[in-house]
UniProtKB/Swiss-Prot annotation:
Its EC number is 6.1.1.11. Belongs to the class-II aminoacyl-tRNA synthetase family. Type-1 seryl-tRNA synthetase subfamily. L-serine binds at T230, S231, E232, E284, T382. Keywords: Aminoacyl-tRNA synthetase, ATP-binding, Cytoplasm, Ligase, Nucleotide-binding, Protein biosynthesis. Its main location: cytoplasm. This is Serine--tRNA ligase. PROSITE patterns: AA_TRNA_LIGASE_II. The keyword Nucleotide-binding applies. The lineage of its organism: Bacteria, Bacillati, Actinomycetota, Actinomycetes, Kitasatosporales.
Amino acid sequence: MIDLRLLREDPDRVRASQRARGEDVGLVDALLSADELRRSSGVRFDELRAEQRSLGKLIPKATPEERTELLKKAEQLKADVKAADAAQDEAAADAKRLLLQLGNIVHEDVPVGGEEDFVVLETHGTIRDFGAEGFEPKDHLELGEALGAIDMERGAKVSGSRFYYLTGVGALLELALVNAAIAQATEAGFVPMLTPALVRPRAMEGTGFLGQAAENVYHLEKDDYYLVGTSEVPLAAYHMDEIIDADKLPLRYAGFSPCFRREAGTYGKDTRGIFRVHQFDKVEMFSYVDPADAEAEHRRLLDWEKQWLTALELPFQVIDVATGDLGSSASRKFDCEAWIPTQGKYRELTSASNCDGFQARRLSVRMREGKKVQPLATLNGTLCAVPRTIVAILENHQLPDGSVRVPEMLRPYLGGREVLEPVAK
């Protein structure tokens, strides 16, 4: 959530942020009114409690005649205090409900617009000219089936659409990618973690994945648990309700977990293959930092993502994601998009988001510097979303005979194998 002081002192900035996101600007004024009511309700309750305490001191000293009148007044005050307490709680709940609907304040440099209004910041690598090489590229599913690496048919038979099996070299390729990603993260100073896939509502809400994003989340209603769509959720909640000494920052974690996404609203998109699926594995970087270091850490996360994609020898571009595509928690987001030859365009492989103090406030994660205690900043960045990375590797490193060259960086994790070859049918 945003800092309420900012809302009170500069509501126009909050309105501008909501407008840039394409969200309801009226929410700002509703929240201002609710916040004022919450504060005035609190003052009213405190005044009545003070009057009640003062009256309580007078009663023992009063004469019999005075005591009767004071006791009547005390009875009325008791009812008034109870009503004021209820009004205070109701006002606080209403203000919190509205506050949780408000997105983070967008960074001033973020391009304004929707999904297609991003700005390309960098391009890396060379896009292959398959025509000049004399063959038509196959898509990742055709390649994966020939390699004995991907089985969509049985995935659909067992679990339905957007499910799959990784088999043989496909399974080995996932394990190689995960181990290589964890190795890079560990070398960069991240603490590796295997995180829970089920979380309580507060963790999901605290990271901003309920509200508008709730339609893409799997909810186990009987137990009131949520399946995570990213290990960002359990990593952000790891230090929930804690105060961290400033001299221990930054704290960096690399989480590996299964991820579950309903993919609501994507009917008809990416229906072939494993680019958009309901379940996948991912290595995620997560940082807790001093707010003053948040922008620099954001660039560091992006640099680690670029290092990873460069090591995989993939052509990619870096984009500054537009305001309408940020998600509620991020103030700014950089995506790395790899070139997918058979689609003829760049597609998202990684995201790096600066959430400032937005998640930390919701989850009550704070830092202590001297006598000062304040929310810290949280940031997250994809290192390896496995299926999409496999898609990019298969398509960009395919050879004319349907085999796939293994990027040099991955070879030690695949027993030295240099080429993945089609299996005999």
